[in-house]
UniProtKB/Swiss-Prot annotation:
Keywords: Ribonucleoprotein, Ribosomal protein. One of its GO terms (cellular component) is cytosolic large ribosomal subunit. Signal peptide: none annotated. This is Large ribosomal subunit protein bL35. Pfam families: Ribosomal_L35p. NCBIfam families: rpmI_bact. One of its GO terms (biological process) is translation. GO terms for molecular function: structural constituent of ribosome. InterPro entries: Ribosomal_bL35, Ribosomal_bL35-like, Ribosomal_bL35_CS, Ribosomal_bL35_sf.
Length: 65
């Protein structure tokens, strides 16, 4: 059986932690930032762990992360 191809778009958006969890960036950070508080914008800069069910789908797209 041939190797699976990595979904390049997904590979650029997600990272795997040392424990195997998948991390993603927050949305809502590109524009309309004036009304958002500094605390909210600061927290949006951090990554967040994906939900288990979503992570399973992403793991299929990027099997070799």
């Amino acid at each position: 059986m041939p190797k699976m191809k990595t979904h390049r778009g997904a590979a650029k958006r997600f990272k795997k932690t040392g424990t195997g969890k998948i991390v993603r960036h927050h949305a809502f950070t590109s524009h309309i930032l004036e009304k958002k508080s500094p605390k909210r914008k600061r927290n949006l800069r951090k990554g967040t762990v994906m939900h288990k069910t979503d992570a399973k789908r992403i793991a299929r797209l990027v099997a070799y992360l």
